[in-house]
């Protein structure tokens, strides 16, 4: 089945009354999924075609939030999804100041419900190492980092600039696959890395978000655990055959960052 046939099949299953798709355009950039801009009777949607279909019992809660694109349909048994197209610019092409970033993060977290599901960073890292055939090799890193969660609340956990769109009505957040309760400072750090902030700007964003001082140790260990998560995800993807150049680069860059932080 080619891409066009796959998109048609998903649209037909999720929106049964659709008779004809007028246009299908592939959207580059997805590492885990394939995304398509689809036009149906002058309306524009995004169809997410997942490469690894699996049940997603909690994701619908997050993708239904007003801070996400409007949800049209989601198959929670496999993850295929249709949302309404949003006009705007990804944060890959525009930037927020550290203070603007802190306000975005605060609004984001205030909108995300807690107690839906848990995103345990340590468990995720261990799972990725296991999937890559490197069972237990994360432990020396974890022992050196000694990261401790400060508080737990609903988080996004993947705030790279490709997942945030600046629109005329404010910021909208995409890709809620990994949402769940976690330390919100993990989200802050992930956002700051994506924004390419300087060391001082990391502090400014984190302290503006928290409304209090942040110790060098807290910032450093959270940066390190975030980078180890990025490395762990990359080695798992590569082990599964996803040899995208960007993933290989992430594997090498993130573990080098961990070394530098330690």
Residue locations for each model-derived region?
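An alpha-helical support segment within catalytic cores of ATP-dependent transferases
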Residues: 3-18, 111-157, 161-162, 167, ...
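Conserved N-terminal boundary motif of the eukaryotic protein kinase catalytic domain
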Residues: 18-26
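A short beta-turn/loop motif at secondary-structure boundaries
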Residues: 26-30, 74-76, 222-223
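Active-site acidic catalytic loop and adjacent metal/ATP-binding pocket
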Residues: 28, 32-39, 47, 142-188
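A conserved alpha-helical element in kinase catalytic cores
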Residues: 33, 43-108
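A glycine-centered beta->alpha junction motif in the catalytic cores
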Residues: 52, 79-94, 110-113, 127-128, ...
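Activation segment
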Residues: 52, 88, 171, 179-181, ...
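Active-site activation/catalytic loop segments of kinase-like enzymes and analogous catalytic loops
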Residues: 185-214, 224-242, 252, 257
